[in-house]
């Protein structure tokens, strides 16, 4: 919902660019993409990603973020078994996660890789679940997984429901600026 294919127009002519609209929870779609394109790296950006939406429709987040990620992991793990040893050694699966899996940041301190997960919404719980699945594929199948925990990202083309665009649009429109909880949350921005 938040993506806009027009944002990719500057790379559409690249030989290694392919746009495929599909559902990562669909085994056949994933199998066909892997066979047709034989990627060296898979970066899993596919996610339902807005906390407020996860309150209204948590099952959609579980479907995409948990079931979809598990299907992508499973099908990719099956697929790489057909690759040469050299290709397997070079292959990477990058799971894009979120800092939300750690819960709320206190006014002092920061998160690290050893901070325990403490998700507080269906969104963060679904992303924590997908991270645990990715780790389990790494440990069980020696599957080459890297997990990143991005903080709040901001930049051109960001969907207007995200915090910075929402605050700017509301301020320019003389609308109320939403305050979450007691307004004491601390967030990192990239």
Question: Where is each model-derived feature located?
Answer:
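N-terminal Rossmann-like NAD(P)+-binding domain of SDR-like oxidoreductases, especially those catalyzing
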Residues: 1-153, 173
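Donor nucleotide-sugar recognition loop
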Residues: 66, 185-186
């Amino acid at each position: 919902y938040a993506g806009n294919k027009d944002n990719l127009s500057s790379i559409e002519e690249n030989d290694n660019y392919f746009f495929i609209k599909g559902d990562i929870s669909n085994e056949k779609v994933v199998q066909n993409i892997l066979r047709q394109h034989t990627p060296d790296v898979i970066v899993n950006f596919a996610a339902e990603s807005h906390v407020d939406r996860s309150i209204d429709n948590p099952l959609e987040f579980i479907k995409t973020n948990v079931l979809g990620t598990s299907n992508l992991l499973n099908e990719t793990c099956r697929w790489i078994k057909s690759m040469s040893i050299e290709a397997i050694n070079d292959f990477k699966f990058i799971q894009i996660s979120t800092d939300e899996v750690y819960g709320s940041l206190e006014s002092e301190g920061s998160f690290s890789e050893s901070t325990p997960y403490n998700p507080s919404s269906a969104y963060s719980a679904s992303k924590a679940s997908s991270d645990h699945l990715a780790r389990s594929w790494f440990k069980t199948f020696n599957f080459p997984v890297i997990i990143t925990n991005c903080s709040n990202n901001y930049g051109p083309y960001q969907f207007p429901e995200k915090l910075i665009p929402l605050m700017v649009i509301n301020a320019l429109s003389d609308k109320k600026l939403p305050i979450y909880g007691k307004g004491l949350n601390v967030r990192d921005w990239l």
